[in-house]
Swiss-Prot record:
GO MF term list: ATP binding; four-way junction DNA binding; four-way junction helicase activity
Sequence segments annotated as region (Domain I): 1-62
Major location (coarse): cytoplasm
Name of the protein in question: Holliday junction branch migration complex subunit RuvA
Biological source species: Bacillus anthracis
Record-stated family: Belongs to the RuvA family.
Function: The RuvA-RuvB-RuvC complex processes Holliday junction (HJ) DNA during genetic recombination and DNA repair, while the RuvA-RuvB complex plays an important role in the rescue of blocked DNA replication forks via replication fork reversal (RFR). RuvA specifically binds to HJ cruciform DNA, conferring on it an open structure. The RuvB hexamer acts as an ATP-dependent pump, pulling dsDNA into and through the RuvAB complex. HJ branch migration allows RuvC to scan DNA until it finds its consensus sequence, where it cleaves and resolves the cruciform DNA.
Region: Flexible linker, residue numbers: 142-152
Oligomer and partners: Homotetramer. Forms an RuvA(8)-RuvB(12)-Holliday junction (HJ) complex. HJ DNA is sandwiched between 2 RuvA tetramers; dsDNA enters through RuvA and exits via RuvB. An RuvB hexamer assembles on each DNA strand where it exits the tetramer. Each RuvB hexamer is contacted by two RuvA subunits (via domain III) on 2 adjacent RuvB subunits; this complex drives branch migration. In the full resolvosome a probable DNA-RuvA(4)-RuvB(12)-RuvC(2) complex forms which resolves the HJ.
Subcellular location: Cytoplasm
Region (Domain II): 63-141
Length: 205
């Protein structure tokens, strides 16, 4: 229904952003809302209009490729919008695609809500069908350019990041395990989320 929404970021929360377009605020659920910052600069968010009997929502993405992977994930039995967002929030799209192509169930089950059965279904449904999802279209989440000076981070950003992890479906015990590592750094909310997800997907669970 909507290809994209262009406007200004009015609100950023753990699960969604609000984009103001001509005086109308669009609530858009995104994989990691904190990649969007409130500013007077106009942005474009590529959207997916999700409609079911009990829900109608807009999901938003920074690129068409990210949205494409989201729609492909929704086509897998056992994966709903929240699960698909949690997978995309990791920012490790290339690894997700590689895991599917190499039938790496151990990697896939690290995502919240993905058990062995769902991981197998992802492989069965998507293997060989992700050539149009280009990993290079996604921002490198851990590039040196994104590192913040230590003086710029604060506990407020970390608190927001932890809240976002819980919203993605990670259990409190999982969140608690990555906190010591996160406390060693001083990052933006977005970077804390990406760092935490990297730790969770690489064994800190």
């Amino acid at each position: 229904m909507f290809e994209y929404v262009t406007g200004y970021v009015e609100y950023v929360g753990p699960e969604y952003v609000v984009i103001d377009h001509n005086g109308i605020g669009y609530q858009i659920f995104t994989p990691n809302p904190y990649v969007f910052q409130r500013s007077k600069q106009e942005i474009r968010v590529y959207t997916y209009h999700y409609v079911r009997e009990d829900i109608m929502a807009l999901y938003g993405f920074k690129t068409r490729e990210e949205r494409l992977l989201f729609t492909k994930l929704l086509g897998v039995s056992g994966i709903g919008p929240k699960g698909a967002l949690a997978i995309l929030a990791s920012g490790q799209t290339g690894q997700v695609v590689q895991a599917i192509e190499h039938e790496d169930e151990k990697f896939l089950v690290k995502f919240p809500g993905v058990g062995k059965k769902t991981a197998r279904q992802m492989i069965l449904d998507l293997k060989g069908k992700l050539a149009d999802v280009v990993p290079d279209a996604f921002v490198d989440l851990f590039s040196d350019e994104e590192r913040f000076d230590e003086k710029k981070g604060s506990s407020a950003e970390l608190d927001e990041a932890l809240e976002a992890l819980r919203a993605l479906g990670y259990a409190e015990r999982e969140v608690s395990r990555v906190v010591p590592e996160l406390l060693k750094e001083s990052l933006t909310t977005d970077q804390y989320i990406k760092k935490a997800l990297s730790l969770l997907l690489n064994g800190k669970r």
